[in-house]
């Protein structure tokens, strides 16, 4: 075994040395083939860069730096840019590059920004009309800025350069014009501003007035977009969520609260985005296009749940994501579980049981609307109800309930849901599917006391009678209602002297 391991090590060393020699040749050979070049750049993170130092071949290391930077500046293929930026980040942090990193990054900064500055030279960015070539140049430049900021702390690109910062703000503000051809570079500008603030905050010093000023400028613009709309609303929402999450959790002198009005707009925009994606997701099936949709959903949902978890968004806004439980991929459902945990923590530990119950009702209403629309989502409605039940209790061994949500809040939730059913019946147009709501509600009976169950049952009878709604025995459409009623009476029966006061319909 020791001989085999020694041979494997020797083989690995030979491979590394061969790679040092072969990679520059391959990069030169395929310099015009962006997809192939992107594959080659993906090799760099798996290289042991110390080999250059160990073999005293720093000339080859410097040459690799030049090659990667050259390809980063020559191409605009998104995957190639991402992999080139990752390679630059690794080369910049290699120990043997310490004496050249600063100068090389400064040169790269100048190269990245020169095309941007040339395009914007002596122009009023907020009012000028960009040609097709201008749009292409801006998109390429901002894509490089964004990709670098995503891969490493490249905030020096915008530090101490107020004119450039103002240009970036102005380019992002062009989202208000809603020109289709400018959509991509507006997205890059907004995302770059957000990433800059993330990196700048990470290394912030006390009383960083420039950071506070720039943060406020970006948030003011984002809030304006949330109010008035733009053609990059998904990007606006994502930036709003990550910035408010960041600045809700930092030290006190930088901390800001997300206004309730902005929270509501974020929740509304998030729900609108998911509502738009549901039919697209259903149509794509298992196609390749589904992967991009999955990534987009995950990006927005993860930012949204993070904002809920830290408290930047109030628990009442969890309904916006929970409504769509079961309608997307499994990662989305796991993020819904995170939202349910936030609700449970609030219900049990923050005396916010009423808000949690209101959120449960809103989530059920949203899921019912999807059921009315598509007719095949009943299992998703029921699965959602099972998850929401976890927000109302803390379980112990053997599924025992160790702690439960406030009883009065739960009674109000059940009564309000019954009233929602009555409203569905009054509105009509649901083809007799209204009672499916009880198929979800039955899963929220677990924490009720006998007296609470009896109170809900009595109130339900009164509400139905007042609305002249009479459940029909033998009609399968009413089965969920009778199952719910039976469950209430079974809970009430746990207190023997209450049993005789209620009879099934």
Residues of each region from the PLM?
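Amphipathic alpha-helical segments within extended alpha-helical solenoids and repeat-rich scaffolds
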Residues: 1, 16-29, 57-77, 104-128, ...
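Single conserved hydrophobic/aromatic residue that forms the stacking wall/gate
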Residues: 2-15
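Hydrophobic residues within the alpha-helices of tandem HEAT/HEAT-like
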Residues: 44-48, 87-95, 141-153, 189-200, ...
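Long, acidic/serine-threonine-rich intrinsically disordered regions with weak helical/coil propensity
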Residues: 127, 132-140, 144-256
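Extended alpha-helical scaffolding segments
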Residues: 249-252, 272, 276-287, 292-310, ...
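C-terminal, active-site-flanking charged/polar segments
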Residues: 302, 306-316, 320-348
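Polybasic, low-complexity terminal segments and linkers that are predominantly intrinsically disordered
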Residues: 479-482, 490-505
């Amino acid at each position: 075994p020791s001989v085999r391991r020694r041979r494997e090590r020797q083989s690995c060393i030979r491979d590394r040395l061969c790679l040092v020699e072969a990679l520059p040749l391959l990069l030169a050979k395929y310099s015009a083939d962006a997809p192939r070049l992107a594959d080659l750049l993906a090799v760099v993170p798996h290289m042991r860069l110390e080999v250059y130092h160990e073999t005293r071949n720093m000339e080859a290391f410097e040459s690799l730096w030049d090659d990667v930077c050259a390809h980063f500046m020559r191409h605009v293929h998104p995957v190639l840019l991402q992999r080139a930026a990752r390679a630059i980040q690794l080369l910049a942090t290699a120990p043997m590059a310490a004496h050249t990193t600063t100068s090389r990054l400064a040169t790269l900064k100048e190269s990245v920004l020169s095309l941007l500055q040339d395009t914007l030279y002596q122009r009023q960015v907020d009012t000028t009309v960009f040609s097709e070539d201008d749009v292409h140049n801006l998109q390429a430049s901002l894509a490089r800025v964004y990709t670098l900021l995503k891969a490493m702390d490249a905030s020096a690109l915008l530090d101490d350069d107020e004119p450039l910062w103002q240009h970036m703000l102005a380019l992002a503000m062009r989202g208000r014009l809603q020109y289709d051809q400018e959509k991509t570079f507006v997205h890059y500008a907004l995302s770059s501003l957000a990433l800059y603030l993330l990196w700048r905050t990470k290394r912030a010093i006390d009383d960083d007035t420039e950071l506070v000023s720039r943060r406020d400028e970006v948030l003011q613009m984002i809030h304006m977009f949330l109010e008035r709309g733009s053609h990059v609303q998904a990007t606006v929402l994502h930036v709003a969520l990550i910035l408010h999450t960041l600045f809700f959790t930092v030290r006190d002198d930088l901390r800001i609260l997300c206004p309730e009005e902005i929270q509501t707009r974020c929740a509304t925009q998030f729900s609108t985005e998911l509502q738009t994606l549901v039919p697209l997701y259903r149509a794509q099936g298992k196609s390749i296009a589904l992967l991009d949709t999955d990534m987009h959903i995950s990006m927005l949902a993860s930012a949204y749940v993070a904002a809920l978890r830290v408290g930047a968004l109030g628990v009442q806004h969890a309904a916006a994501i929970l409504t769509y439980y079961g309608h997307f991929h499994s990662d989305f459902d796991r993020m819904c579980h995170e939202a349910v945990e936030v609700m449970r923590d609030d219900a049990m530990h923050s005396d916010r049981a009423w808000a949690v119950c209101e959120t449960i009702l809103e989530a059920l209403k949203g899921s019912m609307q999807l059921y009315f629309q598509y007719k095949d989502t009943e299992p998703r409605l029921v699965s959602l109800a099972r998850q929401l039940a976890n927000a109302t209790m803390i379980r112990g061994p053997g599924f025992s309930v160790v702690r439960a949500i406030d009883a009065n809040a739960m009674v109000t939730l059940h009564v309000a849901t019954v009233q929602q059913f009555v409203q569905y019946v009054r509105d009509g147009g649901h083809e007799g599917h209204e009672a499916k709501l009880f198929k979800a509600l039955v899963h929220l009976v677990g924490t009720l006391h006998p007296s609470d169950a009896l109170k809900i049952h009595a109130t339900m009878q009164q509400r139905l009678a007042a609305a002249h709604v009479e459940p029909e025995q033998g009609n399968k459409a009413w089965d969920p209602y009778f199952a719910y009623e039976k469950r209430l009476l079974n809970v009430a029966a746990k207190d023997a002297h209450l049993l005789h006061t209620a009879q099934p319909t």
